Amino acid sequence: MKVTLIAILTCAAVLVLHTTAAEELEAESQLMEVGMPDTELAAVDEERLFERSVSCEIEKEGNKDCKKKKCKGGWKCKFNMCVKV
């Protein structure tokens, strides 16, 4: 009984991992089909970095370290910048 249960759970875990990996590959292939050149991808990355640093609300008090406030819309403050979670 225990062996059967372990086998079923193992198969279920493998199926979930396989499905997740397949979805990631499909998403990557769709990005590649768009045909976006590397220079445009670099520009998008720069925009995201700017977006992260701008969307984080940080308050300075004199010479003290920054106090992190809550970021909005799925962003989390980390290292004085917002990071998408």
From Swiss-Prot:
Found, by tissue, as follows: Expressed by the venom gland.
Pfam families under this entry?
Toxin_20
Which residues are connected by disulfide bridges in this protein? C56-C77, C71-C82
The UniProt similarity line reads:
Belongs to the neurotoxin 12 (Hwtx-2) family. 02 (Hwtx-2) subfamily.
Compartments (UniProt record): Secreted
A Gene Ontology molecular-function term? Answer: toxin activity
Which residues are processed away as propeptide to yield the mature protein?
A: 23-48
Please identify the protein, giving its name as recorded. Answer: U4-theraphotoxin-Hhn1ab
- What does the protein in this record do? Postsynaptic neurotoxin.
Annotated GO CC locations: extracellular region; host cell postsynaptic membrane
UniProt entry keywords in alphabetical sequence: Disulfide bond, Neurotoxin, Postsynaptic neurotoxin, Secreted, Signal, Toxin
**SUPFAM superfamilies, per this entry?**
omega toxin-like
List the signal peptide residues: 1-22
